Design a protein with these regions (language model features):
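Active-site phosphate/pyrophosphate- and oxyanion-stabilizing loops and adjacent acidic/basic residues
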Residues: 4, 46, 95-96
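C-terminal boundary motif of the adenylate-forming
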Residues: 18, 63, 101-127
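Conserved C-terminal "lid"/linker of ANL adenylate-forming enzymes
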Residues: 106-108, 131, 156-218
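Conserved loop-to-beta-strand segment in the C-terminal subdomain of adenylate-forming
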Residues: 26, 112-137, 164-179
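Gly/Ser/Thr-rich phosphate-binding loop
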Residues: 1, 14, 105
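Conserved ATP-binding/catalytic segment of the ANL
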Residues: 9, 18, 23-25, 29-83, ...
Length: 218
């Protein structure tokens, strides 16, 4: 097994990466074929035709790559978006990299049909407070915390470090910090704790619009 991969495909399973859609080099939708793959949707020929092509390949909807025989899944096809310049952005890969920081609780990457991707970031407030306390400072509310320049500088450093792992067109050019926690109860997260993209984009519509309307403060 290789770290970051889901292992090698089963012996009787054929795996192919469809690189026709123009993702990153070597990356594309994962197609599979073999006796263990479903033959179609019950009494739903339209759905079957969408999922299984004329050559019998099942289109998984996952984006990934083969790395020396190991299969690596990088995103879901339905979550990938294009910038106005026609470049594909795989938000999950960027979000996961940013969430590696102890100072980031949640993040969503936005920028569909825009010139560049941006991020809405929910800080891990407990960790950020400890960072302030280590400097002998105490902070009031979460709202106070996200408006402090030191917090923005801290998160910018994390964004810059994350950006080093991605292509020029994938780099987060701007971000905004938000103070309200995302949860299942308040509707931003699924029961599996995945983010509900449409809900979050709608919730922060004004904030996102501000990023792309020339309102360029961090």
């Amino acid at each position: 097994h290789r770290v970051g991969s889901v292992g090698k495909p089963l012996p009787n399973l054929q795996v192919k990466i469809n690189q026709e859609d123009g993702y990153r080099q070597g990356e594309g939708e994962i197609l599979v074929k073999g006796p263990s793959v479903m033959v179609g949707y019950y009494k739903n020929p339209e759905a079957t035709a969408q999922a299984i092509d004329a050559q019998g390949w099942f289109h998984t909807g996952d984006i990934g790559m083969l790395d020396e025989g190991f299969l690596r899944i990088t995103d879901r096809k339905k979550e990938i978006f294009k910038t106005s310049g026609g470049k594909y952005i795989a938000p999950l890969a960027i979000e996961n990299k940013l969430r590696e920081s102890p100072y980031v609780a949640q993040v969503i990457v936005v920028g569909e049909n825009q010139k560049f991707p941006s991020a809405i970031i929910l800080p891990e407030f407990e960790t950020v407070r400890k960072w302030y306390q280590s400097q002998g400072k105490t902070i009031g509310s979460n709202e106070d915390l996200i408006n402090r320049e030191e917090t923005k500088d801290l998160i910018k450093q994390i964004v810059d470090e994350s950006n080093a792992n991605f292509g020029q067109w994938e780099k987060i050019k701007q971000f905004r910090l938000v103070a309200d926690e995302w949860s299942i109860a308040s509707g931003e997260l699924t029961p599996k704790l995945s983010i509900k993209r449409k809900v979050i984009v709608a919730k922060y519509k004004d904030l996102i619009d501000g990023i792309y309307s020339g309102n360029n403060h961090r």
